[in-house]
Amino acid sequence: MFQLELVNVVMHQRKAIEDTMRKKKKQQLHKFEMLPSPYDTAWVAMVPLPGSSSQLPCFPQCVEWILQNQQSNGSWDLNQLDSITKDALLSTLACVLALRRGLLFIGRNFSIAMDEQLAAPIGFNITFPGMLSSVIEMGLEVPIGQTDVERVLHLQETELKREYEENYRGRNTYMAYVSEGLGNAQDWNEVMNFQRKNGSLFNSLSITAAVLVHNYDAKAHRYLNLLLNKFGTAVYTKNIHRQLSMLDALENMGISRHFDGEIKSILDMTYSCWLQRDEEVMLDITTCAMAFRILRMNGYDVSSDDLCHIAEVSDFHSSHQGYLSDTRTLLELYKASEVSVADNEFILDRIGSWSGRLLKEQLSSGALQRTSSIFEEVEHALDCPFYATLDRLVHKRNIEHFAAMSYISYAQNNIPDELERIDSWVKENRLHELKFARQKSAYFYLSAAGTVFDPEMSDARIWWAINGVLTTVVDDFFDVGGSREELENLISLVEMWDEHHKEELYSEQVEIVFFAIFNSVNQLGAKVSAVQGRDVTKHLIEIWLDLLRSMMTEVEWRISNYVPTPEEYMENAAMTFALGPIVLPALYLVGPKIPESVVRDSEYNELFRLMSTCGRLLNDVQTYEREDGEGKVNSVSLLVIQSGGSVSIEEARREIMKPIERCRRELLGLVLRRGSAVPGPCKELFWKMCKVCYFFYSRGDGFSSPTAKSAAVDAVIRDPLDLAAVVASQEPIYIIPAS
């Protein structure tokens, strides 16, 4: 496990402290600074000098490091957490073996070894008793009662008996993986079958060193030599896995944008290893799955075919992680399976199927303790796919639940001001006077603040929310609030635009709705035209006209009882889902210049089509009953009609989920593809809105419900991060991602 120090962020000193935090983190990430592994260092220290009859150390610098780094509590636990872990016991016992001294810490904390409620490194019940036996054989005085010693040694006996009795395909792999604890009972020639091209065993320093303790091997010796030349007096484990874990932690807490250059270095290095099929990446299932997911989500071209060696559940069970049904590995595999970008990525589908099934079995069987963090991680992953939640909810959950760090995006400080501007806009435009209109400013601001959260994106958030509120009013006007004459009058007024005074206003309702559109488009047009360096107001008007005309088509279908073909319906309905006025203007406010050629590019239109289709179909699946009662058709009812009644409503809903899945995958693929016409930050906005649609419609009609998403509103908008204890302490906070 490694630590990454983050300084506290105090609200009233936010700018100075943010700068300090950023500098420190950049230094650490740039140098890939991680704490040494006392456990691995101890095993390397035990490697004898080849040909030495007096058991002189081959790597005396590691012995010196152990001598210099015993902590004040007697351990070699560099993490310095409030509570002692099994990992600390294991590391300390290994250092005891290397130095033949320092057993007081083990004696004081021996009960931890027997506590089944505590998390333990893989193979702890074999390696810890095995090393304790070695300590006793050396004649060192162990400050532990004989009964307790026997209880711990019995752990290994029971574990070995169970392992041999069950005899799964991964048994040999697992037994090789816990070689440090087996000593002379191990078949070291059998272990050498797992040696990799670089000379290591499982890319593990401790296992490789354990081999050299019992048998000399030139390749293994060369591997350790190379690492000692690189690191100096101590060694570190699984470099790529740790760096990816660090990167993942930064992204999950929403602060990765501060370290773009450093993160790119890690990603480029990992991608190079991926292309070379480096064993450190490809042969460790956890690292392989994590690397695939992170590389793909950062736009690197990685094929799911490269996961063919772990496509089947039998491949998993043949590994040491699979032999133990390791939850962390299963979770990484499941998360990797979710980043599919095409309908034909069957390997990801298979991985997702069996890893999800095994995770559900672990939850239901009680194999995971309900109070453990991994239980909640698994439950959350199965319950809430990454494409169905808002980024800010993920960030807050990781920061608060795992007590990882004290950090708060300063976008949150802008929330009261931004909400006030939106509420003022609603009142200034008299939208609150329209009795037929749903008031959804909180939900639209939630969708904006939950996805477009960087401080400099304030205008994008505000106009995303304003246009969302306005499209809802217009949608309700066309659905229930306006007569045909009023709707035709509204469209005519928008078509005339600056010459609208030549057209008579049919009603006060038309007046309110039209001038809300007119004033907002002109105000936004002036702002984005200044940002873009060209007049884009005409484009904003076109966006609204496309929406209004499509909505009118639906009205005419309803009035005439016309049943459109599925193709006619989808072409029109994707537009009437009304994401155009929300997303497309916001593209102008997220940074890049967008020339007219990009707006007319086929990729731009395809991004919009996929996003809108996905949102519309998700909405259709959840709102069928309400819309049917209003005399409106949607994709669900059309499928039933087209089948002549042979398809039930539930069957139709399940069938509609297939094109939803396909559109989502294609959209993600298009967003992640490099070298395209539409700038990356703009493409990301289409994906963010797709996630918003899933968030509101993956389980019922969360948008129409006044309470379904109230907890999310509270979490993102109303409730600050729970940092009181952290800020009060003013102590450094440590991040410790799972190993």
Swiss-Prot record:
Binds 3 Mg(2+) ions per subunit. One of its GO terms (molecular function) is terpene synthase activity. The keyword Lipid biosynthesis does not apply. Its cofactor is Mg(2+). InterPro entries: Isoprenoid_synthase_dom_sf (IPR008949), Terpene_cyclase_plant_C1 (IPR044814), Terpene_synth_N (IPR001906), Terpene_synth_N_sf (IPR036965), Terpene_synthase-like (IPR050148), Terpene_synthase_metal-bd (IPR005630), Terpenoid_cyclase/PrenylTrfase (IPR008930). A motif (DDXXD motif) lies at residues 475-479. Mg(2+) 1 binds at residues 475, 479. GO terms for biological process: defense response; diterpenoid biosynthetic process. Its EC number is 4.2.3.-. Pfam families: Terpene_synth (PF01397), Terpene_synth_C (PF03936). Keywords: Lyase, Magnesium, Metal-binding, Plant defense. Expressed in roots and stems. Mg(2+) 2 binds at residues 475, 479. Mg(2+) 3 binds at residues 619, 623, 627. Belongs to the terpene synthase family. PANTHER family: ENT-COPALYL DIPHOSPHATE SYNTHASE, CHLOROPLASTIC, ENT-KAURENE SYNTHASE-LIKE 3. The Asp-Asp-Xaa-Xaa-Asp/Glu (DDXXD/E) motif is important for the catalytic activity, presumably through binding to Mg(2+). This is Ent-kaurene synthase-like 3. The lineage of its organism: Eukaryota, Viridiplantae, Streptophyta, Embryophyta, Tracheophyta.
